[in-house]
Design a protein with these regions (language model features):
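Basic, ligand-binding patches in group-transfer machinery
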Residues: 11-184
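N-terminal Lys/Arg-rich, disordered targeting/topogenic segments
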Residues: 1-11
Length: 184
């Protein structure tokens, strides 16, 4: 009987230590997922891409929300295309310094495809897996401290989908940011 009393506190400590370890592991996984979700996915040269517009693709591009909160830019929208299936779609940003020309490099954001209702987008038989959610931590964007603006574009399967499709401009003045425009 005396041994049972001694083992109960030991068991309690083991259970508490295991619970604390599980909480630490869960916090680490959440932190890694956040870092991954807000990391850039590289750059690509505009000259390596074929320039096109949503109209030329028989598609409709919309940006539903663009916001900066807690140092993270989040974009939600869709590129509705007819019967496409799986797509490699990325949101890209093109930098233009104040008083200068747009750069050739397109900075690609981490972009996740999501299902959306395409009924009101004007494309018949559009694939419902055409929505996107993109995010980036603003301090990870190039051109820190420079004044200028980023313009949002879509990059899909070797094509730069532009023509003001998204209508989003992200202005930078020193370390402050302003989101302007958007198609909806």
């Amino acid at each position: 009987m005396m041994e049972e009393r001694k083992s109960a506190p030991v068991m309690r400590r083991v259970v508490l230590a295991a619970a604390a370890l599980m909480l630490c592991a869960a916090a680490l996984v959440c932190a890694l997922l956040y870092v991954n979700a807000t990391t850039l996915r590289g750059t690509v040269s505009r000259t390596a891409l074929t320039l096109t517009t949503p109209d030329e693709l028989g598609a409709a591009a919309e940006l539903w929300s663009a916001e900066t909160a807690h140092g993270v830019l989040k974009l939600r929208g869709a590129l509705a295309r007819r019967g496409i299936g799986a797509v490699d779609l990325r949101v890209g940003l093109i930098w233009k310094p104040d008083g200068g020309a747009e750069e050739d490099a397109v900075t690609l954001l981490n972009t996740q495809m999501v299902r959306v209702d395409t009924a009101g987008m004007g494309v018949q038989d559009a694939d419902d897996h055409c929505g996107f959610v993109a995010a980036v931590k603003l301090k990870r964007l190039p051109h820190r401290g420079e004044n200028g603006q980023y313009r949002a574009v879509l990059v899909s399967e070797g094509q730069l989908i532009d023509g003001g499709a998204l209508g989003l401009t992200l202005r930078r003045q020193g370390e402050s940011w302003t989101v302007e425009g958007g198609s909806r």
